[in-house]
A protein has these predicted regions:
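Cytosolic covalent-transfer regions centered on His/Cys nucleophiles
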Residues: 2-175
Length: 175
């Protein structure tokens, strides 16, 4: 995550990133809106189908790895958002999918709220730093209430994809 630092009037600012990791790993075909799922299990199975159909990764590999990670602890962020993720042996580069459910599902999130927005993340088994950077970026992205609202309301997958991949963090005063 390349960040430029500017010193101005005795205050330190973080400047926008040139390109985000997330923008490089989310193909438009992996954005699915208003998917009907009644449970976390069904959502993981549907994610398996998305990655199988669009990226050629076996659905069972995807869902098994998502479940394995979820057994370690919930990947729910809160505020109706979850980031299920798993390590995939043999995967060459990280991949993502965004799914908005038609109705929220229980997810054991820290705030106890059900989840409607899911960002599925598949990571090569040998990647650690980039994995953490992508998770951090997603958490920052979805911590913005206005951004979450747009993700819940946008009716068009293409414009939602554009919003996701063009997102940049706001300048923040760190001094």
């Amino acid at each position: 995550m390349a960040r430029e630092v500017t010193y101005n009037s005795g205050r330190l600012f973080l400047v926008r990133r040139v390109m985000t990791h997330f923008s490089q790993i989310l193909p438009e075909t992996n954005v699915v809106l208003d998917l009907e799922c009644s449970s976390k299990k069904r959502a993981f199975e549907q994610a398996g189908l998305i990655f199988e159909n669009n990226c050629g990764i076996a659905r069972s590999t995807v869902s098994d790895n998502l479940f394995a990670r979820e057994r370690l602890g919930s990947t729910g962020l809160g505020q109706g958002v979850a980031v299920p993720h798993g390590r995939i042996r043999g995967l060459k580069a990280p991949l993502a999918a965004f799914v908005r459910l038609s109705e929220p599902i229980p997810f054991e999130s820290p705030d106890g709220e059900p989840v409607k927005l899911l960002i599925f993340l598949l990571i090569p088994d040998n990647v650690t730093q980039q994995h953490l950077e992508i998770l951090s970026e997603i958490a920052e992205m979805f911590s913005d209430k206005n951004f979450r609202s747009a993700m819940n309301e946008d009716a068009d997958a293409k414009s939602l994809h554009t919003r996701l991949v063009s997102w940049q963090p706001a300048e923040r005063n760190v001094a």
